[in-house]
Structures are given as structure tokens and as C-alpha cells.
């Protein structure tokens, strides 16, 4: 990157949660509508590294690690998909307020596209443009009864044992070597 990024944690009001934020060009183009980047599943700010200089050429750019990803706080999410979605959307709104952005261009990739869409539906007054790059979301899971019929008992037992472990736990344990 040729532009000098500013990286910092943004504390979310009323919680102990923090969102890791990379910003570029926030002073020299402060009159332009900022571009906010939301990464996808299993990703983080690094997803955008090859695009940041170009994207920040003539406007402020913010890339955030969504809660539970990258350097952002690990929080307990609801097991209800709709509630978990609202938790993530609210964290983006709390972040926007903390940073002081009135309106933004919101770009989401993959799961970030799903979250960007949900955010825009809930906070349309804050989104000037919505850009979706390969967006997707998780369908609601089948009822417990259907699920228990479809999955063999031994698989359910293994799932109970490993469910506390996140698939990216090994990467987090690697610390800086995992980047």
C-alpha cells in the first residue's frame, strides 16, 4: 500500500466490544462520502489490501473486521439466526456512530454483502449507495426434529464435542504467524 493507513480499535457504545478499523484518506477527502468495506466469512481487513490504494484515491475508506472476525472482539451471538443478524447489524450501526459517519457507500463481500444488505434495510438513511460483491447468507436451519432425523446419532455426538471450537481457532492460536 502506498497510502498510509490508520489502524485503531473503535469502542462500541454501551458494550465492551471493539471493532478493528483501518482507515485511509479521511482527512484530505473529508467532504466526500466515505466507502465502508465489510469482508466475508473467514476473512478480515486483509481481503481488501490490494484494492485499498485505488479505492481511497479520491475518498475516505474504512475497512472493518466484523465482530467475531480478525482483531475485533469475540462476542456471544444468539443461536437464533435473526437475532444474531441483528446483533451484527447493530454493531455496524454503533461503529458508524462512534466514527462519526453520517452517510456512507457500503460495500460488502460474501457474508459482508448479506450484512450490508441487512444494514441498508434497517438504516437506509445512512446508506448513500450499496455495493454487493458475491453476497450470500445462511438459510435458517431446519427444525430440531427434522435435523435429528437427518443426522446420524454418532455425528451429533461428535458435533457436541467439537462445537465449542471455532474452525479458525488454530489460526488465532498461531497469532502473528497466522497472518
Regions found by a protein language model. Give the residues of each.
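Aromatic/hydrophobic pocket-lining residues that form π-stacking "cages" and hydrophobic walls in ligand
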Residues: 92, 116
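An N-terminal hydrophobic leader/cap segment in hydrolases
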Residues: 1-11, 17-20
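Conserved HGGG/HGGXW glycine-rich cap/lid loop of the alpha/beta-hydrolase fold
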Residues: 15, 22-77, 99, 109-114, ...
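Flexible "cap/lid" subdomain of the alpha/beta-hydrolase fold that forms the substrate-access gate
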Residues: 3, 31-32, 82-90, 97-98, ...
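Non-transmembrane, interaction-prone segments in cytosolic or luminal domains
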Residues: 5, 58, 73-75, 89, ...
Amino acid at each position: 500500500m502506498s497510502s498510509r493507513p490508520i489502524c485503531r480499535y473503535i469502542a462500541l457504545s454501551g458494550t465492551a466490544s471493539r471493532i478493528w478499523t483501518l482507515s485511509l484518506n479521511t482527512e484530505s477527502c473529508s467532504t466526500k462520502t466515505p466507502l465502508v468495506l465489510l469482508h466475508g466469512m473467514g476473512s478480515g481487513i486483509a481481503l481488501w489490501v490490494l484494492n485499498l490504494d485505488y479505492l481511497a484515491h479520491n475518498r475516505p475508506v474504512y475497512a472493518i473486521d466484523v465482530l467475531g472476525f480478525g482483531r475485533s472482539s469475540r462476542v456471544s451471538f444468539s443461536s437464533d439466526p435473526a437475532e444474531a443478524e441483528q446483533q451484527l447489524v447493530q454493531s455496524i450501526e454503533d461503529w458508524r456512530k462512534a466514527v462519526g459517519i453520517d452517510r456512507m457507500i457500503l460495500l460488502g463481500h460474501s457474508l459482508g454483502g448479506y450484512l450490508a444488505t441487512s444494514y441498508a434495510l434497517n438504516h437506509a438513511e445512512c446508506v448513500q449507495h450499496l455495493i454487493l460483491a458475491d453476497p450470500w447468507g445462511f438459510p435458517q436451519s431446519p427444525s430440531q426434529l427434522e435435523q435429528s432425523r437427518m443426522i446420524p446419532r454418532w455425528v451429533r455426538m461428535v458435533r457436541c464435542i467439537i462445537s465449542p471450537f471455532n474452525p479458525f481457532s488454530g489460526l488465532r492460536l498461531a497469532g502473528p504467524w497466522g497472518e
